[in-house]
From Swiss-Prot:
GO biological process, one term: transcription by RNA polymerase II
Keywords in alphabetical order: DNA-directed RNA polymerase, Nucleus, Transcription
Protein name per Swiss-Prot or TrEMBL: DNA-directed RNA polymerase II subunit rpb11
Family as reported in the entry's similarity comment: Belongs to the archaeal Rpo11/eukaryotic RPB11/RPC19 RNA polymerase subunit family.
Organism whose genome encodes this protein: Dictyostelium discoideum
Cited InterPro entries: RBP11, RBP11-like, RBP11-like_dimer, Rpo11-like
Length: 120
């Protein structure tokens, strides 16, 4: 078959950067971030987190082609900040949310195990 190997969907080629940023020359305070080997899951998470930021004027993402697992995220900010700072702030916030979710999940699993152990 002509299908690519599955590992090609998530393994970065040698020397490739996971994230690149290109400033938009036509729109002030705008940049395009390209994230390699990711899909709609990451694109939508980042976009939704960026939209929650008061300094963001526009945040959107797209996948250039369905067979390429790359996400382009376009961001425009107001004059109070720049796109890179907003992305960094959003990533930190998402990281805290994921840590909280993981801790909550582990706590609930332990509670469930303790209840199950009572009946054994």
């Amino acid at each position: 078959m002509n299908a690519p190997d599955r590992f090609e969907l998530f393994v970065l080629p040698d020397g490739a950067k996971k994230v690149t940023m290109v400033r938009d020359t036509k729109i002030p305070n705008a940049s395009m971030f390209t994230i390699l080997k990711e899909d709609h899951t990451i694109g939508n998470l980042i976009r939704m987190q960026l939209i929650a930021d008061q300094d963001i004027i526009f945040a959107g993402y797209r996948m250039p082609h369905p067979l390429e697992h790359n996400v382009n995220i376009r961001i425009q900010t107001n004059n109070n900040t720049n796109p890179l700072e907003c992305v960094q702030k959003s990533m930190e916030c998402l990281s805290r949310e994921f840590t909280s979710l993981e801790n909550s999940f582990i706590e609930q699993v332990q509670k469930k195990r303790n209840v199950a152990d009572q009946y054994i």
